[in-house]
Swiss-Prot record:
Its main location: membrane. One of its GO terms (cellular component) is plasma membrane. Keywords: ATP synthesis, Cell inner membrane, Cell membrane, CF(0), Hydrogen ion transport, Ion transport, Lipid-binding, Membrane, Transmembrane, Transmembrane helix, Transport. The keyword Transit peptide does not apply. This is ATP synthase subunit c 2. It comes from the Bacteria. It is found in: Cell inner membrane. CDD domains: ATP-synt_Fo_c. F(1)F(0) ATP synthase produces ATP from ADP in the presence of a proton or sodium gradient. F-type ATPases consist of two structural domains, F(1) containing the extramembraneous catalytic core and F(0) containing the membrane proton channel, linked together by a central stalk and a peripheral stalk. During catalysis, ATP synthesis in the catalytic domain of F(1) is coupled via a rotary mechanism of the central stalk subunits to proton translocation. Key component of the F(0) channel; it plays a direct role in translocation across the membrane. A homomeric c-ring of between 10-14 subunits forms the central stalk rotor element with the F(1) delta and epsilon subunits. It holds the Pfam family ATP-synt_C. It is a multi-pass membrane protein. One of its GO terms (molecular function) is lipid binding. InterPro entries: ATP_synth_csu_bac/chlpt (IPR005953), ATP_synth_F0_csu (IPR000454), ATP_synth_F0_csu_DDCD_BS (IPR020537), ATPase_proteolipid_c-like_dom (IPR002379), F/V-ATP_Csub_sf (IPR035921).
Length: 88
């Protein structure tokens, strides 16, 4: 396989693992918030506000993974070095 195939596979696996972690984290956060609201409905506003801030922090992981995948695909800093090594 050539360099570009490995780049595509790496970006794909990175997005898959990052999205899996983000999805699990958000699911656990929502589960815990709903359990807290079920136990104490009076604190639902405070719990939901805290949950939304937490979800935004968790979602930032997916955004960072996406940015790294785009860098790997389109602005790979090792592309020139690898192509020179492959040409030898």
């Amino acid at each position: 396989m050539d360099f570009f195939s490995w780049v595509m596979i790496t970006a794909g696996f990175g997005m898959a693992i990052g999205s899996l972690g983000t999805g699990i984290g958000q699911g656990l956060a929502v589960k815990s918030a709903l359990e807290g609201v079920a136990r104490n409905p009076g604190a639902s506003g405070k719990i939901l506000t805290t949950m939304m801030i937490g979800l935004a922090m968790i979602e930032s992981l997916a955004i960072y993974v996406f940015v790294v995948a785009m860098i790997i695909l389109f602005a790979n800093p090792f592309q020139d070095v690898v192509l020179e090594l492959l040409a030898k």
